[in-house]
Each structure stands twice: as C-alpha cells, then as structure tokens.
C-alpha cells in the first residue's frame, strides 16, 4: 500500500531538478495537447497521463514547474507562459457602440410617432395655397407679421431637434451606465484572489494572474478558476454539475480521476493542483467562446431553430450546454466572467422552470402603477385628438359651410397633424418616463454609496428589497462576533483550568498528544503569522477555530510548525475533512512500524459520544463511561457554554500493527472507540457595535434570529449578550434536532402549519445544519400567519449555505470568511462580515423606497396638471397652451433632472424609526395623494387664471385661438414660464412625503439637488428669453418674470397650508400604487412574465421590464426605459437577484443563476437521497488512501441545479466587491 509519503519521497528530487524556464526553449507540452488532455474524463485521462507523461509529476516537469515549490514568480517567465498558454481571462462581448445605442433609443414608439408627425408637419409647412384661395381655406396665416408665414417649418424642425436631444441623452445614459457597470465588473475581477504556491511561498494572487504551471491550493468552498490536474488531495469532492449536469459530487484522486475543471465547486476536502489550462482554453472558457460566437445569431432565431442547432452540436458540447441549462452556475463562475455566459439556453431554461422568486415589492407596485397611468394617458390623448378633429370638421364644414377644395387639402392635413401632435403631447406628458430613470438612478446611487458602508451589492434589486425586510436570520460567528478566536479555558488531565495552563502542569505524554494532534489535524492552510505592525495582534490565516487551537499550542510554548515540517501534508495517510454534517475532522497517520494513529477534533458533544477512554491525571488512559461523560457535560461543557464559549473536544485512537487494517472508507467504524485528550473552551467576543445595531433593527420592526452550528448554551449566551434575547421574554431557543422533530409529521415530512407554530417565537436555532437554515427561511417566507408576507434576509458563509441564500429575499455572504460558492449565491456581500453593515443596507433600502415615492409625488403633480391643461386647453381653444417642444423640455429635462435630484437624497437614521412598509403598502400614501391633489389644484387655478384672464392682467395680446403658424405669444409664454417655475419650487416640497413641515431640512447636504434646481432655473431663463420660435416663446419683461417667480414660490406657501390639513379628515383620499396581487394576473400574463422577466433582461433591463406588461402591450411610450437597455443588460442572465427593479449589478459577468437549487433536503423526502451515493459507492481500497475517502456515514448530496429561471445575477454587481 503506497501512501502519499512515498510519493513525496519518490518525487522530492523534482523540485530541485527543475529550473525555472528563463531561456527561450519550448515547454515540453503544447497548448493543444493540454486542451485535448483536459477534455478526457476519469480513466481515459488517467490512461493518457500514464502513457504520455508517466504521471502528473511528468507533466510538471514538462511545464517546468515544481510540485512543491511552484513557479519562481520570475516576471519574464510568467509573461512567456501567458504568451504561450494564454491569460486567465475571457474577453467580454464588445460593448455596443454609441451609434448602436442611438439606434436603440430611436426604437421608442412615442418618439417614432413624434418623428413622423414632425416630418409631415415639416413637409406640409412649405405648401402655400394659390393666391386668393387663402380666404377659402380658412385662417391659416392671417394676422402674421410679414415673413412669418414662411417660418411654419420651425415647429416641425424644433420637434425633430427635440427628438434628437432625447435620443442623444438616452444613448448617453446607456453608454455611461454600461461604462460604470464594466468598471464595477473589473473591480470585482481584480479583487478576486486565489491561493497558489510561488517560490515555495503560499500567496494569494488575483485570479486573472493565474497561469499554466502554477501550483494552486484548493479547499472546501472554492470555485476553481482554471483547469488543472490533482497533485495531492484529501477527501476531495467536486460538484461538476455546472459542466456535466451530473448532480452527484465527484470524488477526485490521483489514481481514479485527477482532472479538476474551472467553474466547478469544491464541496469537500482540500488539495493541490497544477494548472494546465486558463481563460478561453479552459473547459469553461471553451464553452463561453462557443456561446459567444453563436450568441447574436441565436438571439435572432426562435426556439425551434435553437433546438435544431443544439441537436447538431457534438456530444460534448451538448452535454455542457445541458449542464448549463440545469445548473446555471457554469456560466456564472466568478473567476472567469463573460457576458456571453448566459445567452444560449436561457429561454429553454426559463420555460423549464418557473421563477422561484416573486417580483420585488417595488417592481410589482411600479408595474401596476405604470399600467394604470399608461392606460389613462392613452385614453386622454385619444379623446383629445377626437375632440379637436370633430370640432375642426364641424366648425369648418358645418358651421362655416366651407367647401372642401383640393388645393386646401395640405392645409387641412396640417391642422390634423397639429391635432395629432397635441394628442401625442398629452400622451408624452401622461406617461412618467422619468420613473424608470429615477429607479435606476436611485438604485445605482445607493449601490455606489453602499460600497462605502461595506455592502457590495451584486443584484440591484436586493438593495431596495432590504428596505422591506421584516426578518434577518444571522450567523453567529464573524457576523455577530469578532471571529478572532482564542482558547481561554481547558479541561485536561481531569482538571478544569479557567485560563490556559502552564505547560509544566500537563503530563508530558498528554502534551505530546495535544501538540501532534492539533498540528496535523488542522488544515495546513491554517496558520498564525506575525503581526503586520509592531505591537499588533498576530494574524490568523485560514479557519479561525483552528487558529485558536494553534494559538493554544503557542501559549503552551510549543511550535506546531516543527511538527508539520516533520510530517508534511503529503505524508498524511487519510483525512476526513470537516464539513457541516460531520462537525468534526480526523486525520490518520501511518507509523514506521505499520501501526496507525487517528487524531479527531470537533464539537464536544459529538466527539465525546465516540470516546470510550479518557487520559487521566497521571497521563494514563482510563475507561470513560456514559455517566463520566454526563459529569463532564454538566461540570465542564455547560458552564463553558453558558459563558458563550465554543467547546471543542480533542481525541485520538491507535490501530496496532498486528491487527487487520480497517476499512478506511467506512468512517463510522474508524472514528469510534476514541480516547479523549482534552476539551477546550474558545472565546469569540461579541462585536461591541452589534447590540446597538440589533436594537435599531428591533425598533425598525425587524426581527433578528440567530442561526448557528454552536451548542445551544453557547448560542443562548451570545444571543443574550447581543440583545436578541432578553431575560424574562417568552422566546424559543431550539436545537436543529428539536426543530426538525417539531416541524415534521409522523412520516418525516415538513408541514407548513407546524413551522407556523414555531417561527414567530423562534429567536435562536443552535446546532443547526445548512438544511435547517434553508427550511427555516423557506418556512418563514411561505408562511401565511401574518397579513403581510415576511421579507427575509439571511447571512451565510459556507458552501452549503447556498440554498438558504438563494431562497431568501436577500442573501448576504461574508466577504472575508465566506466561500466562493456562498458569495456566488448571494445578493449582497458584506466586505467586513459585520452585522452593522446589514443595518446600513436596511437604511439604504428604505431610502430607495422613499426616493421613488418623492419622485412619484413630484412627477404625478406635473403630469396631472400638464394633462389637464393640455386637454382642456386643446378642447376649449383648439390649441395646447403648452406646445409639443415645451412639453418635451418639461418631460425630458425636468423628469430626468428631477429624478436625479430626488433620487440622490442621502438616508437618515430616522428611516429606522418606522416599521417596514410591507408588501401591500401602496407607493402613494394618502398623505402623498393629499399633496399631489392639493398642489395640482393650486397649479391648475394659477394656469387657468393666466390662460383665460392673463392678457387682461398683464395688458398683452391674447394667445388663444391663434392661427396655424402664428408667432409665439407673450401670453402663452407667461403660462409656460409660470408652469415650469411652479414645478421647480414644488420639487422642494416633494423632498418630504410624510407630512413634515420643514421642506428645507438637510437641503444643503444634497449638492446634486441644489445644483439641479439652480441649473434648471438658468436653462428656463435661456429658453424663455432666447428660445424664440423653436420653443414657441416670446421674451418676457422683468415684471412678468417677477410675477412668474412669485406664483411659483406660492407653491411653497401652499404646501405649508396643505400640511396643516390632517390627512385623517380627508376620508375621500385613496391610496395608489398597490402591488399586483397574484389573482389579478391572467394566466397568459404569467406566461409572459416568465418570458420577459426571467430572461437575461431581468437583470439588465430592469427598467424595461417594469413597464413591459403595461406600456409595451398598449404600445405607448416609454422613452427613458430604453435607457435601461445598456448592452450590459442585453443577453445577460439574471443574477440571483430577486426580480426587482433593475439589477444594477448584473452584468452577465457578475451573475449567478438564481434559481433555487434542488436539494435532496430532508424536507422533501423522508429519507435522505442515498441513490447517488450508492452509485458512487466506495471503490476497493487503493494504495493512496489520502485521495480516496468517501464520507459513507452521512451523504449530504446537494445538487446545485439552479433553474435558470430564478433570479440570478450573473454577475455584474452579481455583483460587486470582494473577491467573488
């Protein structure tokens, strides 16, 4: 039986014999050969390696690298390798050019209508009827000044020019947004690091710097950034479903299947691999390339053609695509992101699986509101056109009895075009295109600022969803506590030491067991390094619990590194790595005499149950009976736990040389009959700022629950220190076992009614598995106990937390302690792992909601007034007092600028003083409705007074009933100017939506707001004074300006009057903007949702989706929505995010398919799914045990089959900061 020690001896010469490739000679293996090798599987690959290279060390020799020392790190050598084998980077799809974005913006239905109308108007304006026919054709140019008749073309030209401005602004918005997304994307990529060995040193380098020949260390939770071949492994199991579609975890070993592929997840174990392919040459890169090449064609083809195309592809690729469809993770792997990722099979995926997540609260409400406004606008514009046409026809041909003359036809058509333009103007005004822009700006602004608050938002909508959070299920370690662990108590040689004992107090043989057991039975990647600054604390690298144990040895004046030098990792005979099911780790050593010794460490109650002996005060082993164990639990473990300490038991077992060798793959038979060495108590202090943060959450109506793997007494003590539990309160603390027993029926099935009896009072879930966390989150979300559906946020750091993170409305992954898999499944990454950052996310989320409401209050006031003025003015005077060009200015510029001004208000602590809005609370409250109607009333009175009596007051000519191409009138200019200034001052009123009186409070904290208000005012002066005919404006005098400003400022005084009226008295006021209820959506619309909302656009075209149902269906306009079409949005897969307003972050690059993983969790079936494990039943023993462990005790098979349809961020701010 060979073991790894033999391997390391046999090849110990390799590292010395290999020199770095600094000369110009070629490598002994080509890129093509490596690619061909990595396409083989298991035994085929093994045979090829043996036939062509001897073994993996032969490949290392040809790649001029050392399996122990790695590459030297010489820059010239690294450059040469990149030149020969490529960079670890997949080039993203080219961004759309500015001209492409302009063309997209031109596709807007309303703009097209306006363009056609303007062109017709322009063409007809050059027609003059024959002399003498003017009188017969009606008043076309009567009363015009000399030469004015020839300027009829200006209005058409001005509309065209306005459309050009709109298109350019829209395209520029798209372009800048895309640029911003790409910047965020590159930031993520730069911050993503992986552990490699260079020059004998273990270092972390950016994923993009990994090159062929690097020796990479892989561990539980990693997402592999490149293809490689295993050099050494401990119980390594990989989830390859992202490439193969096979959900069972694949065991990797030197003698069975040594190939490791990029984009796959390490679900268990650890090891080292030599990198053999990177970037576009890796298996995932090859798929990306194929998808990228076919991406544009596929977009144009329908489903059937796509299916045929897929059938034609060769087996391997078909297999990979299938895998992608099933899992979605392949394309999302964070290290190698590319926009091509999710395009190919997205539609197939979404049809196969309905979305698991509902649309976000805000998106649902906005969608419904948009539909209502769109329908109302369409109706008003249609009625306006019909009334104008009928009035003109009846007046001209019926009342005046004029004949229809052929030469007058162009004149009549000009009238009809004018009426049509007025109708379109009403529609333009009615639909608040600024709304999607406000949503985008608000979320984008928030996301940017949240980075400073240590929240890296991967899915835009998660930011807004956090504002509605009603429950947070938080981990304990590192989130509520500092994750700096130290051993502070110990039970050794039958004595309970309240502080770390002196080494002299411990019998030498017990000390020897302790030192060897801790040194070899902690991951070799866990270590304690000297402090970075003088006088600082030593740096803990790797698993923090293991670092506490290594620190314990240093306190005992022993050096773990000496033991590791003597017993290198390659010499470990067998390792049962830690996972969330085992809650322990065991390492087997083979002694020179042929005997074996196993060291185990883990949760004290678990390891103690396996102990049959204990080391006594004199260092001898004595029998350890159940009652002795109960005594230790009562006198040692419970007192430690009640002080908030985590207890770890250390034990060992000897296998004498004469006895038959055990069946190493049967862990239950191996890790039993142990001898207890010691029990240690590890302290992890509560973060000092956490109790105050939890108090804020509770005040804000958010319930905080702790979900931890620690023992229940430790968990209860920490929960009390944090303020989650208070003395005398009637709340539940349950262990995972007890929780499962209470929520399952006699058949072992989970029942929602049972969960509903528990979760409202549950505050602490201890000794819980990731499955328990997922069950709890799902139970709370699916519950119907409360009126409102709960909105749940969850924190997670482990590989198996993925399902819970995905199921939650918002998943938070730990940026420091979190695994790649957890980060990939999350919506927000906490870059400081701190609970207080979650509270900041709540503040920002609520602020987004408020920002949208502020904008709505402002926008709807503008819309109500403008529509009524345009409609009534058109019907009474046959002309809109507000011209098309003026309305485009009000609509585009003021909407855009107002959305920027109101959407960038910073959050305040007062946001945490009220309860969550809830899923059914309308966007427009009764107070807001009071403000909208109140201000609209004031503005309408002012506008109509000016319209019908203004000429007398100012002693000027009336602008009413002007002929077709009349010059601009002072009268209508005053109406327009006053209208705009009223909006400007009302923007200040709109800053407050909860009835506050001081609308100026904090106004100077928002420089953007002040700049925009002043800037808009300056532009308005220019338009009025110098706009002339194109803007239908006439210069105004100082007096007229002062009156306009006075009437505008009146809105501030009127606002004070409105705020004094109690809303409760106004019973007639209704709320608006409720969320869409499920029963309101017809089935075909649901199907449409799957089509539209689950697609890649979900992520990127969040704004468009907002309006899809309503406005797209009734073919009305939404011009700024197209601004959301940035190329990032195109063809992106949906990030995990909830379906919510726009995933800022979602570049395909940042994305992960959000669909819910199919986990054979025990809540789905009574027994655990062991079919897969039977299929993979352990093979006959092989010489190298180190690579062949199978956890046959418990099979936790997690299929990461992510349905494409759930939301997922592929990743742009799939999204954003720490190493994703």
From Swiss-Prot:
Its EC number is 7.2.2.10. The modification Phosphothreonine is found at residues 1116, 1165. Its main location: membrane. The active site is at residue 475. Residues 2-105, 176-366, 440-855, 904-927, 992-1005, 1061-1220 are cytoplasmic. The gene is Atp2b1. InterPro entries: ATP_Ca_trans_C, ATPase_P-typ_cation-transptr_C, ATPase_P-typ_cation-transptr_N, ATPase_P-typ_cyto_dom_N, ATPase_P-typ_P_site, ATPase_P-typ_TM_dom_sf, ATPase_P-typ_transduc_dom_A_sf, HAD-like_sf. GO terms for biological process: calcium ion export across plasma membrane; calcium ion transport; intracellular calcium ion homeostasis; negative regulation of cytokine production; negative regulation of cytosolic calcium ion concentration; positive regulation of bone mineralization; positive regulation of calcium ion transport; regulation of blood pressure. The modification Phosphoserine is found at residues 8, 17, 338, 1140, 1155, 1178, 1182. It is an enzyme of class 7 (translocase). The modification N-acetylglycine is found at residue 2. Monomer. Dimer. Oligomer. Calmodulin binding. Interacts with PDZD11. Interacts with SLC35G1 and STIM1. Interacts with YWHAE; interacts with the monomeric and dimeric forms of the YWHAE but prefer the monomer form; this interaction inhibits calcium-transporting ATPase activity. Interacts with NPTN; this interaction stabilizes ATP2B1 and increases ATPase activity; this interaction controls T cell calcium homeostasis following T cell activation. Interacts with EPB41; regulates small intestinal calcium absorption through regulation of membrane expression of ATP2B1. Mg(2+) binds at residues 475, 477, 797. Residues 127-154, 387-418, 877-882, 949-971, 1028-1039 are extracellular. Catalyzes the hydrolysis of ATP coupled with the transport of calcium from the cytoplasm to the extracellular space thereby maintaining intracellular calcium homeostasis. Plays a role in blood pressure regulation through regulation of intracellular calcium concentration and nitric oxide production leading to regulation of vascular smooth muscle cells vasoconstriction. Positively regulates bone mineralization through absorption of calcium from the intestine. SMART domains: Cation_ATPase_N. This is Plasma membrane calcium-transporting ATPase 1. It comes from Mus musculus (Mouse).
């Amino acid at each position: 039986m060979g073991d790894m020690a033999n391997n390391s001896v046999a090849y110990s010469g390799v590292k010395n014999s290999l020199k770095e490739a600094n000369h110009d000679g070629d490598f002994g293996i080509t890129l093509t050969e490596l690619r061909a090798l990595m396409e083989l599987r298991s035994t085929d690959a093994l045979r090829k390696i043996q036939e062509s290279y001897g073994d993996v060390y032969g490949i290392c020799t040809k790649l001029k690298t050392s399996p122990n020392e790695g590459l030297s790190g010489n820059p010239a050598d690294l450059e040469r390798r990149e030149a020969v084998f490529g960079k670890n980077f997949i080039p993203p799809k080219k961004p759309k050019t500015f001209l492409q974005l302009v063309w997209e913006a031109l596709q807007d239905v309303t703009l097209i209508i306006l363009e056609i109308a303007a062109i017709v108007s322009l063409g007809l304006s050059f027609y003059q009827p024959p002399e003498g026919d003017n009188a017969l054709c009606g008043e076309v140019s009567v009363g015009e000044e000399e030469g004015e008749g020839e300027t009829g073309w200006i209005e058409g030209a001005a509309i065209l020019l306005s459309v050009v401005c709109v298109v350019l602004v829209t395209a520029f918005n798209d372009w800048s947004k895309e640029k911003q997304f790409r910047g965020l994307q590159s930031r993520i990529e730069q911050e993503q690091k992986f552990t490699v060995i260079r020059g004998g040193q273990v270092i972390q380098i950016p994923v993009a710097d990994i090159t062929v020949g690097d020796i990479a260390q892989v561990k539980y939770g990693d997402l592999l950034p490149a293809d490689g071949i295993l050099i050494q492994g401990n119980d390594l199991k990989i989830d390859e479903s992202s490439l193969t579609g096979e959900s069972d975890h694949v065991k990797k070993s030197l003698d069975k299947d040594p190939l490791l592929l990029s984009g796959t997840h390490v679900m268990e174990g650890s090891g080292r691999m030599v990198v053999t392919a990177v970037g576009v040459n890796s298996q995932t890169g090859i798929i990306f390339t194929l998808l990228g090449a076919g991406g544009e064609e596929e977009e144009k083809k329908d489903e059937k053609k796509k299916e045929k195309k897929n059938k034609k592809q060769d087996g391997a690729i078909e297999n990979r695509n299938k895998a992608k469809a099933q899992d979605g993770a392949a394309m999302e792997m964070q290290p190698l992101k590319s926009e091509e990722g999710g395009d190919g099979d997205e539609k197939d995926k979404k049809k196969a699986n309905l979305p698991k997540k509902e649309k976000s609260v805000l998106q649902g409400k906005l969608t419904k509101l948009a539909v209502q406004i769109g329908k109302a606008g369409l109706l008003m514009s249609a009625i306006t056109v019909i009334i104008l046409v009928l009035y003109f026809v009846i007046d001209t041909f019926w009342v005046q009895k004029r004949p229809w003359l052929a030469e007058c036809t162009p004149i009549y058509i000009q009238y009809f075009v004018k009426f049509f333009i007025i109708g379109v103007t009403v529609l333009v005004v009615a639909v608040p295109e600024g709304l999607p822009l406000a949503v985008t700006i608000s979320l984008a602004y928030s996301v940017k600022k949240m980075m400073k608050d240590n929240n890296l938002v991967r899915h835009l909508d998660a930011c807004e969803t956090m504002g509605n959070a009603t429950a947070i299920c938080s981990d304990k370690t590192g989130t509520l506590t500092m994750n700096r662990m130290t051993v502070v108590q110990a039970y050794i040689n039958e004595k309970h030491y309240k502080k770390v004992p002196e080494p002299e107090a411990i019998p030498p043989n017990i000390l020897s067991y302790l030192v060897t057991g801790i040194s070899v039975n902690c991951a070799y990647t866990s270590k304690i390094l000297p402090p970075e600054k003088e006088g600082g604390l030593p740096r803990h690298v790797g698993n923090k619990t293991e670092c506490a144990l290594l620190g314990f040895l240093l306190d005992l004046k022993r050096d773990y590194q000496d033991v590791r030098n003597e017993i290198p990792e390659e010499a470990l005979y067998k390792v049962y790595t830690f996972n969330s099911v085992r809650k322990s780790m065991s390492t087997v050593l083979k002694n020179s005499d042929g005997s074996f010794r196993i060291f185990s460490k883990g949760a004290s109650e678990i390891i103690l149950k396996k102990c049959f002996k204990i080391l006594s005060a004199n260092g001898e082993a004595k029998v350890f009976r159940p009652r002795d164990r109960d005594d230790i639990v009562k006198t040692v473990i419970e007192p430690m736990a009640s002080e908030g300490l985590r207890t770890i038991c250390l034990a060992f077992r000897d296998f004498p040389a004469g006895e038959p060798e055990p069946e190493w793959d049967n862990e239950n038979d191996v890790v039993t009959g142990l001898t207890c060495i010691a029990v240690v108590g590890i302290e992890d202090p509560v973060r000092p700022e956490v109790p105050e943060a939890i108090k804020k959450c509770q005040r804000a109506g958010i319930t905080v629950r702790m979900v931890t793997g620690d023992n229940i007494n430790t968990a209860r003590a920490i929960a009390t220190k944090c303020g989650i539990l208070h003395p005398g309160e009637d709340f539940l603390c349950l262990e995972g076992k007890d929780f499962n027993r209470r929520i399952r029926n006699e058949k072992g099935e989970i029942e929602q009614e049972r969960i509903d009896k528990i979760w409202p009072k549950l505050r602490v879930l201890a000794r819980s598995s990731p499955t328990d966390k997922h069950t709890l989150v799902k139970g709370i979300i699916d519950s119907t106990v409360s009126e409102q559906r709960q909105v749940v946020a969850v924190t997670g750091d482990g590989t198996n937390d993925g399902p819970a993170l995905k199921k939650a409305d918002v998943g938070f992954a730990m940026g420091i302690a979190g695994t790649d898999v957890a980060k990939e499944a999350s919506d927000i990454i906490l870059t400081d792992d701190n609970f207080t950052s979650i509270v900041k996310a709540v503040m920002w989320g609520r602020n987004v909601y408020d920002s949208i409401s502020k904008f709505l209050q402002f926008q709807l006031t503008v819309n109500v007034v403008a529509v009524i003025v345009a409609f009534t003015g058109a019907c009474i005077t046959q002309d809109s007092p507000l011209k098309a060009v003026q309305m485009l200015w009000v609509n585009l510029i003021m909407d855009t600028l107002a959305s920027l001004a109101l959407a960038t208000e910073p959050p305040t602590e007062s946001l945490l003083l009220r309860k969550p809005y809830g899923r059914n609370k309308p966007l427009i409250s009764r107070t807001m409705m009071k403000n909208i109607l109140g201000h609209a009333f004031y503005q309408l009175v002012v506008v109509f007074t000016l319209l019908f009596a203004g000429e007398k007051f100012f002693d000027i000519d009336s602008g009413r009933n002007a002929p077709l191409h009349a010059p601009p009138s002072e009268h209508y200019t005053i109406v327009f100017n006053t209208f705009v200034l009223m909006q400007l001052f009302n923007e200040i009123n709109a800053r407050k939506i909860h009835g506050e009186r001081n609308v100026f409070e904090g106004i100077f904290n928002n420089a953007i707001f002040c700049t925009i208000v002043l800037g808009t005012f300056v532009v308005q002066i220019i338009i009025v004074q110098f706009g002339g005919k194109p803007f239908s404006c006439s210069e105004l005098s100082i007096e007229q300006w002062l009156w306009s400003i006075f009437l505008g400022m009146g809105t501030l005084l009127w606002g004070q009057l409105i705020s004094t009226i109690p809303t409760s008295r106004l019973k007639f006021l209704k709320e608006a903007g409720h969320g869409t209820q499920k029963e309101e959506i017809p089935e075909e619309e649901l199907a449409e949702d799957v089509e539209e909302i689950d697609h890649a656009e979900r992520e990127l075209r969040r704004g468009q989706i907002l309006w899809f149902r309503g406005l797209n269906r009734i073919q009305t306009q939404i011009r700024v929505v197209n601004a959301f079409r940035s190329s990032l949005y195109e063809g992106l897969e949906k990030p995990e995010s909830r379906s919510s307003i726009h995933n800022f972050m979602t570049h395909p690059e940042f994305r992960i398919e959000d669909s819910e993983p199919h986990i054979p969790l025990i809540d789905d079936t009574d027994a655990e799914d062991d079919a897969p494990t039977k299929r993979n039943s352990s093979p006959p023993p092989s010489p190298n045990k180190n690579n062949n462990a199978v956890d046959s005790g418990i099979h936790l098979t997690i299929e990461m089959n992510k349905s494409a349809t759930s939301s997922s961020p592929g990743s742009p701010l799939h999204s954003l900061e720490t190493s994703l």
